[in-house]
Design a protein with these regions (language model features):
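Extended aliphatic helical segments
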Residues: 9, 22-24, 42, 54, ...
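Short, conserved beta-strand/beta-arch hydrophobic-aromatic motifs that form part
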Residues: 35-58
């Protein structure tokens, strides 16, 4: 793991998550967040190549999808974590 990967994992793990928190797994060029309480997938973050920007995905019918109807959601990591924590649809199975 390089330094930026370690920083992403540390920042995700340190976030004050609701519903018992998340576990972070690095996989296929991104980060998958799982509910620590249920083990269910919560979200997937994929670096967007600009500073700490990430593309955001949610679990929908056993696949990863972009939230909303307007294409990719790309946010700075801190804003993406806030969005995941505050939007209930990420936590349906968590």
């Amino acid at each position: 793991m390089n330094d930026s990967t370690d920083a992403f994992v540390s920042r995700i793990a340190a976030y004050p998550w609701p519903r018992g928190g998340v576990a972070v797994e690095r996989a296929r060029g991104g980060y998958t967040l799982y509910s620590q309480r249920t083990g269910a997938p919560v979200a997937r973050l994929k670096p967007a190549g600009r500073n700490d920007q990430v593309q955001l995905f949610w679990r929908c019918r056993d696949t990863w999808a972009t939230p909303g109807d307007f294409g990719p959601v790309i946010l700075p990591l801190d804003e993406a974590l806030d969005f995941i924590a505050s939007e209930g649809f990420f936590w349906i199975d968590a």
